[in-house]
C-alpha cells in the first residue's frame, strides 16, 4: 500500500504489520540488585531497508521465585528505563521488561538504535513528527515506537511468557494504547496518564471559543485519525486499568474520560484517580495496580479491581450523586465535586462524604451554585485497601451567579483538607508520590496543614473569587524554627507567570496571624500582577517545616 499523503486509520496503519523477523537477542550484562536479577538486553526490531532497529531494554526477574507473569513497561520520554517506577513493578513478583523506545538521548550509553532513514524515531530528533503527520502516519516517531513495543511483546512470548501485562507511563501509555489495540498477545493493559488527545493539548473541552485542531490543517487531521491514542480505544479488547491525576498539566483529565467512553462495554475497564495531584500518582495506586496484576496475570488473587459508577439526578436546586459499587464492602465512599471551572488542571475538587439512606444506598446531595457546569466523580475505598473511582460526569446547570466575593475562605482545618493540595512537579524518578499533605496538631490542639514540597490551592480559580489591589491574604501559621515562607500567586495570561512574597517567621509556640497585601506580590523582575482575573492558584512553600490554617482573602 502507498502510504504517502494518505489519511490512514488505526486498522489501515497496523493491519498488515509484520513482526516475523528473528529477534537475534543478546545479553550485555547481568547483575543482582535488591532480590532481582537485572539483565541489559538487545534484540532486533523491524527492518528499515537493509537495516534493523536494535532494541535496548532491562529484563528483570525475581532471583528466588518463579515469576507469576511478565510486565512490559514503556516509560515516559523523560524517564530512565531503570527508574524507580520500573523497580516498583519489579518488587511484586513479576518478570519486567522495560524498553527504550525513545532512542538516543542526552547522557544515554545504551539505547535503542534506529536506522538513519528513521532518524526521527530518536525523540531528540522527532520535531514536528511528534505532533503532526505531514506525509503519512507511518512516517512518524510514533510508528517506530509502537513497532518497538510490538517486537518487545514478541521477545517476552519467545522466552516463555503466556501472560503479559502491558504498562505505559504518560507518553509510554499513549504508545501502549496502540499496541494493546492490535497485539492479541497482550493479556491486559495499565495506562498511566496517557490517553490520547495530544493534538488537543491546551484546548479546553468546555471552552466554547477554543478552536478544534482538526479544523486547522491536514497535518492535524491525519494525526488525530491514526496517531493520537484515543483513536485506538475502541479496538482494545483486553482488560484496562487507567490511572491518572485530576490536575495533570499535560494529560487532560476531561479528555481522558472521552477516551474511556470509547472503550467497548464488554471490555473490563477500571479507573482510579489521584485527587489534586499533577505529575504523580498516589501511593494507593500501587495497591490498585497489584490487584489488577494479580487478577489478570497472577496465579491467585486475594484482592481484585472493582467497578464504581456514579449516577446524577436533579432534585430542584440540588443534585443527588448516587454511588454504585455492587454489594462489595467499602470503608469510605465520597464524591468529589467542582462547579464552574472549565479547565481540568485548575479545579479545586471538594470532597463530600456520602451518607446512607433507608434503602442502603450511598449518595451526596449537592446544592447547585449556578456557575454553569458541575463536574463530579465518586471514589470508593474498599475493605481490602484498594481505591477505585467512577468515570467523571458533568452536568450543565443554569448560570445565574455573577457575584464576586470580596472575602472568601481558601482553607480551614474544620473542613478537612478541602481547598488544598500539594506542589507536584517532577516525576521522572518515580510515578508514585512520596510527598503529600500532612495534618499536624499545633498549639492549643488546633490542626493545620503542611507539605514538604509546598502547599497549593486552586480556590482562586473559582468563578466567584475576586482579587483586587486592595485584597489581603490572611492566614495563621505555626513554626518551631526560623522559617521564611515563600507565598506565590500564579497567573495565566497565555503563559504561566509567578508573583511571590516572602514572609519571615520566628519560632514561637503560638499560632501567628499573618496579613499580606496582594499588591506586595512581585515577579522575579519586580512586576506586579496586571490582571487579577487571570490568577488561578496560590502556593505556600519553605525549606523549613511550617503548619498553616484559616487561609482566606479579605
Regions picked out by a protein language model, each given a short descriptive name:
Residues 236, 242-244:
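Short beta-strand/loop motif that positions the catalytic acidic residue
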Residues 431-457:
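Short carbohydrate-recognition loop motifs
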Residues 294-337, 350-361, 408:
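Surface beta-strand/loop "capping" patches
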Residues 19-65:
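N-terminal cap/lid segment of alpha/beta-hydrolase-fold proteins
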Amino acid at each position: 500500500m502507498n502510504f504517502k499523503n494518505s489519511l490512514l486509520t488505526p486498522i489501515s496503519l497496523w493491519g498488515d504489520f509484520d513482526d516475523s523477523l528473528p529477534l537475534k537477542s543478546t545479553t550485555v550484562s547481568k547483575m543482582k540488585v535488591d532480590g532481582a536479577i537485572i539483565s541489559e538486553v538487545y534484540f532486533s526490531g523491524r527492518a528499515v531497508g537493509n537495516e534493523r532497529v536494535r532494541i535496548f531494554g532491562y529484563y528483570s526477574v525475581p532471583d528466588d521465585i518463579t515469576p507469576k507473569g511478565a510486565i512490559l513497561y514503556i516509560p515516559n520520554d523523560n524517564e530512565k528505563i531503570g527508574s524507580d517506577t520500573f523497580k516498583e513493578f519489579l518488587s511484586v513478583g513479576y518478570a519486567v521488561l522495560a524498553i527504550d523506545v525513545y532512542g538516543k538521548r542526552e547522557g544515554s550509553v545504551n539505547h535503542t538504535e534506529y536506522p538513519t532513514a528513521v532518524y526521527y524515531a530518536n525523540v531528540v530528533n522527532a520535531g514536528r513528527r511528534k505532533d503532526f503527520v505531514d506525509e503519512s502516519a507511518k512516517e512518524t516517531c510514533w510508528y517506530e515506537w509502537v513497532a518497538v513495543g510490538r517486537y518487545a511483546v514478541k521477545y517476552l512470548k519467545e522466552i516463555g511468557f503466556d501472560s503479559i501485562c502491558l504498562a505505559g507511563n504518560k507518553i509510554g501509555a499513549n504508545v501502549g494504547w496502540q499496541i494493546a489495540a492490535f497485539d492479541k498477545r497482550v493479556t491486559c493493559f495499565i495506562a498511566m496518564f496517557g490517553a490520547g488527545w495530544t493534538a488537543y493539548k491546551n484546548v479546553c473541552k468546555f471552552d466554547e471559543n477554543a478552536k478544534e485542531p482538526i479544523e486547522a490543517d491536514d497535518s492535524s487531521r491525519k494525526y488525530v485519525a491514526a496517531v493520537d491514542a484515543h483513536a485506538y480505544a475502541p479496538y482494545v479488547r483486553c482488560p484496562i486499568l487507567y490511572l491518572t491525576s485530576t490536575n495533570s498539566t499535560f494529560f487532560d483529565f476531561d479528555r481522558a474520560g472521552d477516551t474511556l467512553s470509547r472503550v467497548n462495554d464488554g471490555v473490563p475497564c477500571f479507573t482510579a484517580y489521584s485527587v489534586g495531584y499533577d505529575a504523580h500518582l498516589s501511593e494507593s495506586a500501587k495497591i490498585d495496580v497489584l490487584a489488577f496484576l494479580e487478577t489478570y496475570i497472577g496465579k491467585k488473587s486475594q484482592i481484585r479491581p472493582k467497578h464504581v459508577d456514579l449516577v446524577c439526578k436533579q432534585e430542584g436546586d440540588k443534585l443527588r450523586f448516587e454511588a454504585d459499587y455492587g454489594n462489595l464492602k467499602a470503608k469510605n465512599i465520597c464524591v468529589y465535586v467542582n462547579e464552574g471551572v472549565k479547565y481540568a488542571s485548575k479545579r479545586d475538587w471538594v470532597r463530600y462524604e456520602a451518607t446512607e439512606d433507608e434503602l442502603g444506598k450511598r449518595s451526596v446531595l449537592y446544592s447547585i451554585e449556578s456557575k454553569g457546569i458541575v463536574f463530579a466523580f465518586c471514589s470508593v475505598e474498599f475493605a481490602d485497601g484498594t481505591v477505585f473511582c467512577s468515570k467523571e460526569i458533568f452536568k450543565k446547570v443554569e448560570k445565574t451567579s455573577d457575584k464576586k466575593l470580596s472575602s472568601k475562605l481558601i482553607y480551614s482545618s474544620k473542613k478537612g483538607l478541602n481547598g488544598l493540595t500539594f506542589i507536584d512537579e517532577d516525576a521522572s524518578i518515580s510515578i508514585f508520590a512520596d510527598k503529600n499533605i500532612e495534618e499536624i496538631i499545633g498549639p492549643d490542639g488546633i490542626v493545620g496543614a503542611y507539605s514538604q514540597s509546598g502547599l497549593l490551592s486552586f480556590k482562586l480559580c473559582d468563578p466567584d473569587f475576586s482579587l483586587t489591589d486592595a485584597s489581603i491574604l490572611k492566614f495563621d501559621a505555626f513554626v518551631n524554627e526560623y522559617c521564611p515562607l515563600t507565598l506565590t500567586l500564579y497567573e495565566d495570561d497565555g503563559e504561566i507567570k509567578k508573583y511571590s512574597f516572602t514572609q519571615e517567621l520566628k519560632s514561637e509556640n503560638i499560632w501567628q496571624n499573618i496579613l499580606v497585601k496582594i499588591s506586595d506580590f512581585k515577579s522575579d523582575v519586580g512586576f506586579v500582577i496586571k490582571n487579577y482575573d487571570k490568577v488561578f492558584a496560590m502556593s505556600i512553600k519553605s525549606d523549613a517545616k511550617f503548619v498553616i490554617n484559616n487561609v482566606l482573602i479579605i
